[in-house]
């Protein structure tokens, strides 16, 4: 692939890690953010120490506070901003874009107010003549590992397979590999909903339960994620892939996962507001729990783990009692995903 110009919107941990992948591939990378000290640090010290204390970035990776400068003459735009501001940033991008670009996003969540997936938001806010079909970049990926060039395999999903193949070529190298998929609904819902299950797995750890319980919540969590996704129009096979079971494993078993760490803290009895303050990063699984619970209630989808976590976070139920309560639920077949 020839050298491409890519704007990455959101210089958080994942946006920064992906900027390095693209830079390693010889592309022109521009990070955009709205925190002056962070932007100055990236440009002058070539570090982003809030997320990576010991990593020095290549000097070719630049950052700006000026969205117009970031978008000028780019071939592709990657959204890596928190779910709750995706629509706002998309509107700002739409007001500036003056040429067609490949639009990608690598965030994992559902909009709280509308319950919409992020690709839908981008399609609504950015005129079709200025963008490709949206490409979703998702899968089992800790930024802490990608930034040190550890082997990572993820998915590029789009309704337009050619757009997905473009993104596959854009990012893939000797340590970072993408597979294509056309099931956007499946890939996005898997990426968003697995954060809920990671909170649950972390809570079990915080409560002192062992590997048996953690394996159970991850596998039964996959079942309820699949049930909801299929109801929304996804292919059930997607949940067996990188963006499904792959992402669920990496997020539901690792201390690198902010959702897992948040769940572990909840299990230890810490207050949510203290957890969010101490972590200093967005915990997407907290907001997604509420959205998924509401969707499941509207559609009549059985999601006991999501319900237990929802009641603990939003209704003040004791998290241990909520989890143990699932043990007395109605008996079911293991393979029910519909």
Swiss-Prot record:
Positions with a binding annotation for NADPH: 13-14, 108, 143, 258, 282, 284
Pathway(s) the chain acts in: Membrane lipid metabolism; glycerophospholipid metabolism
The keyword Ribonucleoprotein appears for this protein: no
Keywords, ordered alphabetically: Cytoplasm, Lipid biosynthesis, Lipid metabolism, NAD, NADP, Nucleotide-binding, Oxidoreductase, Phospholipid biosynthesis, Phospholipid metabolism
Pfam family, one: NAD_Gly3P_dh_N
Family that this chain belongs to: Belongs to the NAD-dependent glycerol-3-phosphate dehydrogenase family.
GO molecular function, one term: NAD binding
Residues noted as binding sn-glycerol 3-phosphate in the record, renumbered to the chain: 108, 139, 141, 194, 247, 257-259
Broad class of enzyme this protein falls into: oxidoreductase
Organism: Streptococcus pyogenes serotype M28 (strain MGAS6180)
Location(s), subcellular: Cytoplasm
Catalytic activity: sn-glycerol 3-phosphate + NAD(+) = dihydroxyacetone phosphate + NADH + H(+); sn-glycerol 3-phosphate + NADP(+) = dihydroxyacetone phosphate + NADPH + H(+)
Gene Ontology cellular component annotations, sorted alphabetically: cytosol
Gene Ontology annotations of biological process type: carbohydrate metabolic process; glycerol-3-phosphate biosynthetic process; glycerol-3-phosphate catabolic process; glycerophospholipid metabolic process; phospholipid biosynthetic process
EC numbers: 1.1.1.94
Protein name: Glycerol-3-phosphate dehydrogenase [NAD(P)+]
Enzyme active site: 194
């Amino acid at each position: 692939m020839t050298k491409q110009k890519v704007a990455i919107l959101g210089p958080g941990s994942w946006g920064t890690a992906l900027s390095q992948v693209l830079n390693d591939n010889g592309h022109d990378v521009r990070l955009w953010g709205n925190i002056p000290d962070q932007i100055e640090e990236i440009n002058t010290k070539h570090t982003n120490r809030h997320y990576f204390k010991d990593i020095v970035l290549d000097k070719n990776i630049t950052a700006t506070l000026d969205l117009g400068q970031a978008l000028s003459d780019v071939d592709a735009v990657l959204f890596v901003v928190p779910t709750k501001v995706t629509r706002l940033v998309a509107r700002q991008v739409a007001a500036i874009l003056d040429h067609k670009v490949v639009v990608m996003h690598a965030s994992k969540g559902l909009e709280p107010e509308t319950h919409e997936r992020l690709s839908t938001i981008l399609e609504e806010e950015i005129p079709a003549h200025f963008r490709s079909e949206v490409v979703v970049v998702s899968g089992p990926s800790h930024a802490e590992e990608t930034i040190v060039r550890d082997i990572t395999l993820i998915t590029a999903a789009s309704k337009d397979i050619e757009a997905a193949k473009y993104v596959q070529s854009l990012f893939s190298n000797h340590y970072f590999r993408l597979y294509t998929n056309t099931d956007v609904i499946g890939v996005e819902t898997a990426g968003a909903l697995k954060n809920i299950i990671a909170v649950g797995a972390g809570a079990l750890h915080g409560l002192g339960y062992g590997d048996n319980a953690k394996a159970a919540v991850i596998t039964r969590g996959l079942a309820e994620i699949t049930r909801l996704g299929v109801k929304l129009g996804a292919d059930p096979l997607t949940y067996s892939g990188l963006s499904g079971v792959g992402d669920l494993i990496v997020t539901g078993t690792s201390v690198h996962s902010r959702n897992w760490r948040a769940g572990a803290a909840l299990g230890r009895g810490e207050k949510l507001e203290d957890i969010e303050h101490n972590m200093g990063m967005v915990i997407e699984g907290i907001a997604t729990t509420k959205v998924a619970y509401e969707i499941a209630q509207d559609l009549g989808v059985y999601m006991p783990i999501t319900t237990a976590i929802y009641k603990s976070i939003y209704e003040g139920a004791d998290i241990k009692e909520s989890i143990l309560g699932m043990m007395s639920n109605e008996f079911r077949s293991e393979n029910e995903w519909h």
